[in-house]
């Protein structure tokens, strides 16, 4: 589900993480509907190619897109979506543009909701399971710490 306003209005202001009122209203309705399907969903946040130049050091379009995805997640849950229906929330920065011909087009500031098939959900869960990794990988090694003195 690519959520785009019929008038091609952006879902977010430039560099913003607060959903526009019309986007919130749409997500509240979508949240109710998504609860009627048995599948889980993923939510992706997107930016246009305008570099983020806010006052926060090291805050880039990656963080901005992830914050947008979480704003959408909250609106979907407020609309009635069950918390356990969400399998993943991710930020995509500007790597999946809706308007590739105009990468700074505000319509690229959006979220995507993917309703997964059972096979896709199973594959996602398999790739995120630490027990699938060899035991000598950093993710499964015990963390060694030295107590502070």
Model-assigned labels for residue ranges:
Residues 37-41, 85:
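Loop/turn elements at helix/coil->beta-strand transitions in domains of secreted/extracellular proteins
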Residues 1-3, 9:
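Hydrophobic alpha/beta scaffold of the E2-like acyltransferase core of 2-oxoacid dehydrogenase complexes
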